[in-house]
Amino acid sequence: MLLRQLARTVAAAFAIALLASCSAIDSGTLDIAYEHADWLLQKMSTHYVELDKGQAEALRARLDRLHAWHRTQELPMYADLLDQAAERVARRLSKDDIDWMIHSFEERRRVGAAAVSKELAPLLLTLSASQQAQIAGAMTRDNARFAKTQLEPDAAALSKERTKWLAGQVERWTGKLTPGQFERVRRVAPATADFPAERLEQRRRWQAALLRNVRQYRDEPALGAALTELLESPRSVADDGYIRAVARLEDELTQMILDLDRTLTTEQRAAVVTHLHTYSRRLRELAARSA
């Protein structure tokens, strides 16, 4: 949907999904993805709601401002974080290192959320009741697709797919995993089997809260404040089950990373460090270009 996707993708599209997917694309594709991030976000919005001409022009202008801000202010910070992460990986990771990485990137996400709220609150105030209904319908369809792909397969098939995906993410940084390393990755999925269902329920709660805010607050400061809180602290609408599931997932992934770190070959560790420095350099080059 327009609201959720724009909120989430300042850190994702504008930062090129750092540490999640940027290593899966070459530097040329990285440049194209970033240079056209605002256009891509605007195109994505049409999946969720049909904007009138004035709204579409306003959205484009606001995305242009977000893009320019992110390029000059945020990309250098992401580059610094990647270089610091490379240094920590090179000397072997500790739990404190992983906690630092999580905290650092969460802080950048919160900053991005605040910027999104500032730009989008005025536009959200212009959405008609029918446009809000379009967004609600898109939410329902997206959730149905999520349930079909993430919940409907049998437990064994779902666990296998989650393992395949997670191993692929790791191998994008390390290169081919050894059988023992793959087995360590495989243990994460069954230990966090409840997460997809909890995630779907959290999506629904978050979406309902977002639409409720858009309908309830009809002045820019009030809507902006509510939107900022929701984007900066999405767990504010979470229930205990989701909070426990997220904590368990974070613990499992943290321990997986620590266990893998102890088994990395010299070549694998060098590959991770090289990838981190490479993407840091590309982000600095992008930041140096005129907006």
Question: Residues of each region from the PLM?
Answer:
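Short, structured motif recognition centered on aromatic/hydrophobic residues
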Residues: L41, S45, A58-L59, V116-L127, ...
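Extended, structured, electrostatic nucleic-acid-contact surfaces
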Residues: G28-Y48, R109, A113-A121, P153-T174, ...
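Bacterial N-terminal signal peptides that target proteins for export
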Residues: M1-A11
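Extended amphipathic alpha-helical interaction segments
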Residues: K118-A238
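Post-signal-peptide N-terminal segment of Sec-exported extracytoplasmic proteins
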Residues: A37-T72
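A cross-kingdom marker for long, charged
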Residues: G28-A33, D38, Q42, L200-A291
